[in-house]
Each structure stands twice: as C-alpha cells, then as structure tokens.
UniProtKB/Swiss-Prot annotation:
InterPro entries, sorted: LemA-like_dom_sf, MamQ_LemA
Pfam family, one: LemA
Primary subcellular site in the record, as a coarse category: membrane
Cell compartments where the protein resides: Magnetosome membrane; Cell inner membrane
Induction: Part of the probable 17 gene mamAB operon.
Outcome reported for the amino acid change (mutating Y181A): Does not restore magnetic response
Protein name as annotated: Magnetosome protein MamQ
Segments on the Lumenal face: 68-272
Cytoplasmic side stretches: 1-46
Gene field: mamQ
Protein topology in the membrane: Single-pass membrane protein
Organism placement in taxonomy: Bacteria, Pseudomonadati, Pseudomonadota, Alphaproteobacteria, Rhodospirillales
Role, per record: Essential for magnetosome formation. Not essential for formation of magnetosome membrane vesicles. One of 7 genes (mamLQBIEMO) able to induce magnetosome membrane biogenesis; coexpression of mamLQRBIEMO in a deletion of the 17 gene mamAB operon restores magnetosome vesicle formation but not magnetite biosynthesis.
Length: 272
C-alpha cells in the first residue's frame, strides 16, 4: 500500500508539472503572436454619397446661374426691341405729320380756289345777264342746290358753256379741275386727317405701354435678391421708362407752319 501511494503522488506531480509547462508554452506563444485589433475604417458608401451630393449641388447651382443669365438676356433684348418699335412709331409720326397736314390744307385750298372763282364768275354772269338765259339758268341752279350742281351736272354745265363764251371759258377751266379732282371735299379730308393723327397717337401710346411693361419685368428681375448680385457681376443695368412729358412731344401746327403749308394761297397772293 505504501508503494501504491508513492506512485500515485509521483503521477500527480508529473501531471502538475506538465500542466505548468503547457501554460508556460501558451503564455510564450501568446507573447510571440500578439493579435492586434485594427480600428474600424469608415465604409466607402457614405463618403461616395456625400461626394455625389456635393457634385450634383454644384452642377445645379451653375445650371441655375446660366439659366438666370439667359433669362436676363432674353428680357433685355425684348425690352430693346419694344423700345425700337416705339421709336419707329415716333419717327413715323414725325415723317407723316407734315405731309398729312400739307395734303389736307392743300386740298382745302384747292376747294376754296374752285368755289371762290366759281362764285366770282357766277356774280359777274348774273350781273351781266340778268333776265337773260344765263342769269335765269344760274338762279335756277342756285335754288336747286347752288353752284355745286352746276359743276356736277355735265348737261347744265355744257348748256351754259354754249350760252356765253367768256363765262364758258372760265367755267370750263374750273370744270376741268373738278373732273381732275372729282371728290374735293375739305370736311372729309380734315376728318380723315384727324382720324389718322388720333390713330398714330393711339399706336404710340400702345407701343409705349408695351415697352414700359417689358422694361418693368426686366428691372424687377435684375433687382430681386439674390439675382441682383448676378446682374451686377454680369453688367446688367436698369432700363429707363418712357414718360409722357407735360407739354408732350406731339407736333403742333404753328401759324408759320400753317402759312408754309398753303402754297396755293401764297401763289395767289404773289400773283395779286
């Protein structure tokens, strides 16, 4: 029994020594192969997403600036085009005003000349041939509608032309003028002139309103924040409006112009 106990104790010692050696070996191996845990790296997904968002934002910003710049150009050119149309209407009025007034006044002077000479000859004929065929015919025509019927009625005019040679020659020249200008009516001519002038002024007012509306749209666009900085950098400036002056720029017929526009009257005065 003593031998068996000694053997058992020796076996236990051997096992304990073996366990100690195994632990020492594990510790040595652990010191030799130390496992270092590396810090976790941020994944590439969030970085790429942030980069994509930044690029898209930059592209959208540049695109917006370019579109706004093009809008400025479009509005500015539209305002300039309507300004040009307004100035064309002003120039058209200036060009037509004098000619239109001259034509109307000459028309009236022609009518005045025709009826003035006709009236003079009528008086001379009536005084020279009272009770005769010419005087009776003229008095009858006056009762029926005046000398206008004489000039408009070819039969009556020819009858009087054959009745008196002197009066016939003068009246023949007047009838030739009437045949050349068959619708000499100064009242209608003046009415047409006034209608034309009013129409021109209405067109000018319409063009001025169109330009001012276009200029207002452009001015508001370049003065709104933050686009006023873009307009300042790119050189876009405000467009001035057209305002009607108190006195107006409409041409007026002065006494000097009225006298200059009556060449027939001047020629008659120079002859007299």
């Amino acid at each position: 029994m003593a031998v068996s106990d000694a053997d058992a104790s020796s076996v236990d010692k051997v096992e304990s020594i073996t366990l100690q050696r195994v632990k020492q070996s594990e510790e040595l191996l652990a010191q030799l192969y130390v496992v270092e845990e590396s810090p976790r790296r941020m994944g590439r997904g969030p970085v790429q997403l942030m980069l994509a968002i930044s690029v898209l934002s930059l592209v959208a910003f540049i695109t917006t600036l370019l579109m706004r710049y093009n809008a400025f150009v479009t509005m500015y050119e539209d305002a300039q085009a309507k300004r040009s149309n307004f100035e064309v209407m002003i120039q058209r009025r200036d060009n037509l005003f004098g000619n239109l007034v001259k034509l109307t006044l000459n028309h009236a002077a022609l009518e005045h000349s025709i009826f003035s000479h006709t009236s003079d000859k009528r008086k001379e004929s009536v005084e020279a041939g009272k009770g005769g065929p010419i005087g009776s015919a003229i008095e009858q025509l006056m009762k029926q509608g005046g000398i206008g019927k004489l000039l408009g009625d070819g039969g009556a005019g020819k009858a009087l032309l054959g009745a008196d040679g002197g009066f016939g020659n003068a009246l023949g020249r007047l009838m030739a003028i009437v045949e050349q200008y068959p619708t000499v009516q100064s009242a209608d001519t003046y009415k047409h002139m006034m209608t034309s002038l009013v129409d021109m002024e209405d067109r000018i007012a319409s063009k001025r309103e169109e330009f001012n509306a276009s200029a207002a749209t452009y001015n508001v666009a370049i003065t709104k924040w933050p686009w006023d900085y873009l307009a300042m950098i790119t050189g876009f400036k405000r467009v001035e409006y057209f305002h009607e002056k108190p006195a107006g720029d409409t041409p007026i017929i002065t006494p000097q112009i009225f006298q200059e526009l009556l060449p027939l009257t001047h020629s008659q005065e120079s002859k007299n």
